[in-house]
Swiss-Prot record:
[4Fe-4S] cluster binds at residues 22, 159, 162, 168. Belongs to the CRISPR-associated exonuclease Cas4 family. It catalyses: exonucleolytic cleavage in the 5'- to 3'-direction to yield nucleoside 3'-phosphates. This is CRISPR-associated exonuclease Cas4. Mn(2+) binds at residues 49, 68, 80. Its EC number is 3.1.12.1. InterPro entries: CRISPR-assoc_prot_Cas4, Dna2/Cas4_DUF83, PDDEXK-like_dom_sf. The keyword Iron applies. CRISPR (clustered regularly interspaced short palindromic repeat) is an adaptive immune system that provides protection against mobile genetic elements (viruses, transposable elements and conjugative plasmids). CRISPR clusters contain sequences complementary to antecedent mobile elements and target invading nucleic acids. CRISPR clusters are transcribed and processed into CRISPR RNA (crRNA). This protein may be a 5' to 3' ssDNA exonuclease.
């Protein structure tokens, strides 16, 4: 695998997630404008994360990524706990980035998404086509970071519950 750790992989998983949720939110976030502390949905997600999967070491930081918890098996299992599947594409891309990142360090891994409220889990493995999408996502994040103004927000159903709603639409 090509080594992209020089600068491309200083991106965090939340940035990958936000790219697939909302590019405007990503732009605010990378500038340190964080509104999540105002969100009841973020609080609910933190509660689920803290109360789920007892006995697991939580929030494992490896370089620029922060994983909910890991298990050591034949490969490293990356575990992410999510509240619901409404933004499943963003969740999948986030954990694919984690796998990609760890692979660049020579660490074999796979990911497991947990949806405790739905009592579902989803196993994710990095495929060749995913690597290309991750590379494109990294380039797009770098482009969004370079913008002097936020991208024009595109209203979605999720916007009404977003912590950044007022910055975008009021």
């Amino acid at each position: 695998m090509e080594n992209y750790l020089e600068e491309e992989l200083i991106i965090g998983g939340i940035e990958i997630n936000y790219l697939y949720v909302c590019k405007t939110k990503l732009w605010y976030f990378v500038r340190g404008i964080t509104m999540e502390q105002e969100s009841d949905f973020v609080d609910l997600g933190k509660f689920l994360h803290e109360k789920s999967y007892f006995g697991e070491e939580k929030e494992v930081q490896i370089g620029s990524i922060k994983i909910d918890f890991i298990k050591k098996r034949d490969v490293i299992e990356i575990h992410e706990v999510k509240r619901g599947k409404q933004m499943e594409k963003a969740h999948i891309m986030q954990v694919l980035y984690y796998i990609y990142y760890l692979n660049s360090l020579g660490i074999k891994s796979k990911a497991i998404l947990h949806y405790p409220k739905l009592k579902e889990i989803k196993e994710i493995e990095l495929k060749e086509n995913n690597k290309e999408e991750i590379k494109r996502a990294i380039k797009e994040i770098e482009y969004i970071k370079s913008l002097k103004e936020p991208p024009e927000p595109i209203y979605q159903k999720i916007c009404k519950n977003c912590a950044y709603y007022e910055l975008c639409f009021i």
